[in-house]
Protein backbone atom coordinates (compact mmCIF):
# COMPACT_ATOMS: atom_id res chain seq x y z
CA UNK A 1 0.00 0.00 0.00
CA UNK A 2 1.29 3.45 -0.86
CA UNK A 3 1.17 5.84 2.07
CA UNK A 4 0.60 9.56 1.82
CA UNK A 5 4.20 10.08 2.92
CA UNK A 6 5.74 7.95 0.17
CA UNK A 7 8.40 9.67 -1.86
CA UNK A 8 7.76 10.37 -5.51
CA UNK A 9 9.85 11.31 -8.50
CA UNK A 10 8.80 13.44 -11.43
CA UNK A 11 9.69 12.71 -15.03
CA UNK A 12 8.98 14.71 -18.14
CA UNK A 13 8.08 13.11 -21.46
CA UNK A 14 7.80 15.16 -24.64
CA UNK A 15 5.48 14.16 -27.47
CA UNK A 16 5.25 15.70 -30.91
CA UNK A 17 1.59 15.65 -31.88
CA UNK A 18 -0.25 17.02 -34.92
CA UNK A 19 -1.65 20.53 -34.55
CA UNK A 20 -5.24 19.32 -34.90
CA UNK A 21 -5.00 17.34 -31.64
CA UNK A 22 -5.91 19.17 -28.43
CA UNK A 23 -2.67 19.14 -26.41
CA UNK A 24 -4.37 19.42 -23.00
CA UNK A 25 -6.75 16.54 -23.75
CA UNK A 26 -3.86 14.45 -25.08
CA UNK A 27 -1.84 15.14 -21.93
CA UNK A 28 -4.79 14.19 -19.71
CA UNK A 29 -5.37 10.99 -21.72
CA UNK A 30 -1.69 10.01 -21.39
CA UNK A 31 -1.76 10.64 -17.62
CA UNK A 32 -4.92 8.58 -17.25
CA UNK A 33 -3.46 5.73 -19.33
CA UNK A 34 -0.19 5.65 -17.39
CA UNK A 35 -2.02 5.61 -14.04
CA UNK A 36 -4.27 2.82 -15.30
CA UNK A 37 -1.31 0.72 -16.47
CA UNK A 38 0.60 1.25 -13.21
CA UNK A 39 -2.43 0.30 -11.12
CA UNK A 40 -3.20 -2.69 -13.35
CA UNK A 41 0.38 -3.97 -13.07
CA UNK A 42 0.32 -3.52 -9.29
CA UNK A 43 -3.00 -5.39 -9.11
CA UNK A 44 -1.59 -8.27 -11.17
CA UNK A 45 1.42 -8.45 -8.82
CA UNK A 46 -0.85 -8.51 -5.77
CA UNK A 47 -3.09 -11.21 -7.26
CA UNK A 48 -0.25 -13.46 -8.39
CA UNK A 49 -0.89 -16.93 -7.00
CA UNK A 50 -4.44 -16.07 -5.87
CA UNK A 51 -7.60 -17.87 -6.97
CA UNK A 52 -9.10 -15.26 -9.31
CA UNK A 53 -12.41 -17.10 -9.73
CA UNK A 54 -12.93 -17.09 -5.96
CA UNK A 55 -12.23 -13.35 -5.80
CA UNK A 56 -14.63 -12.65 -8.69
CA UNK A 57 -17.37 -14.66 -6.96
CA UNK A 58 -16.84 -12.72 -3.72
CA UNK A 59 -17.10 -9.41 -5.61
CA UNK A 60 -20.33 -10.55 -7.31
CA UNK A 61 -21.83 -11.48 -3.93
CA UNK A 62 -20.97 -8.06 -2.47
CA UNK A 63 -22.65 -6.27 -5.39
CA UNK A 64 -25.94 -8.10 -4.84
From Swiss-Prot:
Keyword entries, A-Z? Toxin-antitoxin system
Q: Which domain of life does the protein's organism represent?
A: Archaea
Q: What does this protein do?
A: Possibly the antitoxin component of a type II toxin-antitoxin (TA) system. Its cognate toxin is VapC1 (Potential).
Q: What is this protein called?
A: Putative antitoxin VapB1
What species was this sequence derived from?
Methanocaldococcus jannaschii (strain ATCC 43067 / DSM 2661 / JAL-1 / JCM 10045 / NBRC 100440)
The gene it comes from is vapB1
